[in-house]
Amino acid sequence: MNLLNLKNTLQTSLVIRLTFLFLLTTIIIWLLSVLTAAYISMVQKRQHIIEDLSVLSEMNIVLSNQRFEEAERDAKNLMYQCSLATEIHHNDIFPEVSRHLSVGPSNCTPTLNGEKHRLFLQSSDIDENSFRRDSFILNHKNEISLLSTDNPSDYSTLQPLTRKSFPLYPTHAGFYWSEPEYINGKGWHASVAVADQQGVFFEVTVKLPDLITKSHLPLDDSIRVWLDQNNHLLPFSYIPQKIRTQLENVTLHDGWQQIPGFLILRTTLHGPGWSLVTLYPYGNLHNRILKIILQQIPFTLTALVLMTSAFCWLLHRSLAKPLWRFVDVINKTATAPLSTRLPAQRLDELDSIAGAFNQLLDTLQVQYDNLENKVAERTQALNEAKKRAERANKRKSIHLTVISHELRTPMNGVLGAIELLQTTPLNIEQQGLADTARNCTLSLLAIINNLLDFSRIESGHFTLHMEETALLPLLDQAMQTIQGPAQSKKLSLRTFVGQHVPLYFHTDSIRLRQILVNLLGNAVKFTETGGIRLTVKRHEEQLIFLVSDSGKGIEIQQQSQIFTAFYQADTNSQGTGIGLTIASSLAKMMGGNLTLKSVPGVGTCVSLVLPLQEYQPPQPIKGTLSAPFCLHRQLACWGIRGEPPHQQNALLNAELLYFSGKLYDLAQQLILCTPNMPVINNLLPPWQLQILLVDDADINRDIIGKMLVSLGQHVTIAASSNEALTLSQQQRFDLVLIDIRMPEIDGIECVRLWHDEPNNLDPDCMFVALSASVATEDIHRCKKNGIHHYITKPVTLATLARYISIAAEYQLLRNIELQEQDPSRCSALLATDDMVINSKIFQSLDLLLADIENAVSAGEKIDQLIHTLKGCLGQIGQTELVCYVIDIENRVKMGKIIALEELTDLRQKIRMIFKNYTIT
């Protein structure tokens, strides 16, 4: 985190970045200088040590050479003086300090020459000094004459003085040097000898301890060793074995050279030809250099700190503070007026920057003032343009609403008149003309709906109305729209609902049906042979609708544009070109998507994918039915096992291949043993309601009024809201159908006044809005203001019958007594005297009640079974029992538990009705 903060700081601050770079550079230079100084010091120190060692070694060599040369000179002088001596008398020497010894054990008496040599040494003037110990004369008979009387007389002691102790040949210039020998109590000695023509050796012994001691005096951390002519260590050279091994493995020469860990100086001495080798350890050299560096570091480090501190202070004072002042002023100008200026009292680059920035601010101030004036002018122009656009958009919305109202009002009259006409006795030709007129009216209505929906989607005023929707009836309604055109083209139709597809789910049923109708309509339009298939399947939490056809297909280059508004792949085809555009937009609004796959000459498949939010999982119907093989797969998805049909039955109807809702209802009736009871008029409700119709359009009042009368209802007409409010004080109504767009007081305001009217006989009755507007905002506004339901014009008999039934259930729930339908109009099945039919009806109802009782005992859901029982009783005209079942159904919906005693009581009432038809 600290490194990240440092990185951010370095990236955002120039001064800190410069300071950091300077410090880093200074430290690097300082380190380089320290390392360079250390290297130079090491080189210089090495050179100084080499020079010191060279000087000291040279002095030691000179001293040693001088001693060895004096010894050689003494030996030579001894020989020379002996050769000049003639006769020496014993009395001439006093006292007697010389001795005669014989190396051989059998020869104890000196010869004449031996005695002569002894007397010569006695009388010679060679004095023993500090570095010469003894003088000897050794003849060819191994007789030794010694100058000192303290020399030992035993042979072992004299052995080093014999000829055998010297090399066969002179070391140099006729001088013979012996190997160094150690004498107890006397230390290390070496002898130098010279031979005359008779082979007599004249020797002088040299003391070595003082030379060895002096060779270690120059530097206390150097090592001095002595080597012979063969580079072998002399016996008095004591060094560690590791260094000894290194020296033995190196070819040494005079001068300086290196071995691992040491500097070496070798110098050859005169006389015996020995070499003095000085070893100086590298570690000592490095320690001396490190000591010097450590002595210098405090000073250099102090100088570094002082220098960097001074530079940082100067940088802060001369650069950082002015820059921060500049940044502060610049930041203030970003949000404050451009009146602030940078200080410009310096004569450097910062002053130039300040001057340029101030000049820029002056220019910006002028441009800003001009821009403000232009912005004010443009803002005013934009506001005026916005207001004009809003007024135009508002006029457009009003115009669309007016167009919708003006188009739907006559369409309502046309469609209502045709439906009323179809309820009258017509011959086959007249019925065909009526069907054609109705289909053309519905096609025209679909075109109007598409155009209005497209306009509302474009303007963003389109919203969805989500509610629980029954899937299978919706599919039947969509397939019903293409049944006629498909049969006229002799196209096969097929619907398949997959396993686990919910029968009830949460969606906008109107818009989903609109999408399917558009897709199916296009499939019929562009398919000449083959068939059309609607498939519904579930994948995880998605519901997938597939509409496939065997038409001519769409070219690949046209598929990407097929959802574009007003685009037509075939310019010769009919249509507005916005059906797929609306379907795609609606799918996206519903949280899904619409995709297309097409192969030219083979066909097209359009898939609609919608999310499953709230739904009821399907409950399988367990049983076995005799049905055509083509229905077995669909029945199996609902839990029904299919068997080949052995006789004529209702499942052989070809329409069941594409009307899956009818197939499901019929299969449920057959499994539950509910006969397919022939009802004379499926639309006729079992109740006669008091209905108030409020509409300012004469044609609407006339047509809708007649449609309500044809459904067996009592209708009261009101042409305005004021008239409706007056009637509310005179009569109680079960249902009020009211147009929401009326002059003076509109329908929504009328409902509000209706609820607030103190003299109203039933202020809480059900209101259903009648309107030519399909705008979702109008629907929401109606429900927000106390209107229960909303019907868009044109209305159909089926729609009116459905809302009459809803109003009847609403009133029964409020314990309002209703009038039963006129028995002469109802034509209930129970009116027949057919013993077999009535017996089957009783058996079916009895089995259905048994299923309900078993479900209650097992704690399972009974809402679907109760709904089926209510429909059966309604079809046979048992209004009293329908009321009883509706009460049970309402309590089930509220989550209350139904007691078995209530079902037993219902069974007794049914037995009382069918007591004359019970087969025992």
From Swiss-Prot:
Changing H140A: Decreases expression of genes responsive to acidic pH and at low pH, lowers survival in macrophages, and decreases fitness in mouse. It is found in: Cell inner membrane. It catalyses: ATP + protein L-histidine = ADP + protein N-phospho-L-histidine. Disruption phenotype: Abnormal expression of genes encoding virulence proteins. Decreases expression of genes responsive to acidic pH and when growing intracellularly. Increases expression of invasion protein invF following invasion of macrophages. Abolishes replication within macrophages. Decreases fitness in the spleen and liver of mouse. Double knockout with ssrB leads to impaired replication in mouse and pig macrophages and decreases virulence in mouse and pig. No effect on level of biofilm formation. Does not affect the production of reactive oxygen species (ROS) in infected pigs. InterPro entries: CheY-like_superfamily, HAMP_dom, HATPase_C_sf, His_kinase_dom, HisK_dim/P_dom, HisK_dim/P_sf, HPT_dom_sf, Sig_transdc_His_kin-like_C. This is Sensor histidine kinase SsrA. Residues 1-19, 313-920 are cytoplasmic. Changing F68A: Decreases expression of genes responsive to acidic pH at low and neutral pH. Keywords: ATP-binding, Cell inner membrane, Cell membrane, Coiled coil, Kinase, Membrane, Nucleotide-binding, Phosphoprotein, Transferase, Transmembrane, Transmembrane helix, Two-component regulatory system, Virulence. Changing H189A: Decreases expression of genes responsive to acidic pH at neutral pH but not at low pH. Residues 41-291 are periplasmic. Changing Y282A: Decreases expression of genes responsive to acidic pH at neutral and at low pH. Member of the two-component regulatory system SsrA/SsrB (SpiR/SsrB) that is required for intracellular proliferation and systemic dissemination within the host. When inside acidic Salmonella-containing vesicles (SCV) within host cells the SsrA sensor kinase autophosphorylates and the phosphoryl group is transferred to the response regulator SsrB; phosphorylated SsrB activates the expression of genes encoding virulence proteins, including pathogenicity island 2 (SPI2) and other horizontally acquired genes, and antagonizes the action of transcriptional repressor hns (H-NS). Changing D739A: Leads to abnormal regulation of virulence gene expression. No effect on level of biofilm formation. Pfam families: HAMP, HATPase_c, HisKA, Response_reg. Changing H216A: Decreases expression of genes responsive to acidic pH and at low pH, lowers survival in macrophages, and decreases fitness in mouse. Autophosphorylated.
